[in-house]
Every structure is written in C-alpha cells, then in structure tokens.
C-alpha cells in the first residue's frame, strides 16, 4: 500500500507542470502520516478532577503498589448512601470518600486494566484512562472490551 502511494506520488510529480525545483522531495513529505500525540508522564494523572458536567469531584492518587485509584471527594452524590451495593453491609455507607476506581496501570501512555464501581447501579465495570492535555483526561468504562462502553472527558480541578 505504501509503495503504491509513493509510486503514484512520484508519477504525479514527474508529469505535473510544476518546475522540478519547486516540487518537494518525497523523503520530506508526510504522505499518510498521522499527527503526533503529546505524551504525558505517568504521574500526570494524579490530582483532583471534575467529572463531565462537573457532577463530581474526584481525587486520583498513586497507591503503594504503583497503580492508581480514584476516590469520590464531592459533588451531587457525596451525601447519598451506597444503596445499590450488592453487599448489604455496604449499603449504609456514604459515597463520599469511597474508592470507585482502582488497579489502573500505566502502560504505553494510557492507564489500563482498571475497575470502576458504579454506585448508580451497584455494578463493577472495566475502565481505562488517558491524559489528553495538561488539564484534561478521557475515561472509558466498558464491559469485556472497550468497544462496548461509554467515554467521559474530565477536567482538572484548580
């Protein structure tokens, strides 16, 4: 595929009316090149973050094991109890202060292999995250594979 693209580009350059000195050499062109993404250090995830729509304030921290976890600090849900928890003993606890995501491992610029507890339905899902800017991240919660999930964009709290 790449050879065909280069051959086509070379043929077009050789038959075009553009003077030879004005045509860029093929080695300097970016035919089919994807833009480079900024990469962020592993600890860029740590800190306080607003969920999408600023519904909740979360604290992301690195654990002693080197993995990351997310703690609910505040927002619309903070005073509610964990009434949908599958463990009846946990249903009286307040949501504020609970770990809702855990086991996030930094790998190839993303945080993967994590789990997310959703207090709205009492179920646990898979989760992955990626820092997309100095003050933004994208989170994806899913079942089995990331294709079967939902994404949210979070904003760093100041």
State what each model feature region is.
Residues 63-65, 130-134, 155-157:
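A short, sequence-level motif marking secondary-structure junctions
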Residues 126-139, 146:
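Short, compact, well-ordered microdomains
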Residues 46, 52-126:
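Central antiparallel beta-sheet cores of small beta-barrel/beta-sandwich binding domains
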Residues 1-7:
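Bacterial N-terminal signal peptides that target proteins for export
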Residues 35-48:
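N-terminal helix-cap/turn-to-beta initiation motif at the start of protein domains
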Residues 18-33:
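Signal peptide processing junction and immediate N-terminal pro/mature segment
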Residues 8-16:
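Bacterial N-terminal signal peptides
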Residues 136, 143-158:
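Edge beta-strand at a domain terminus
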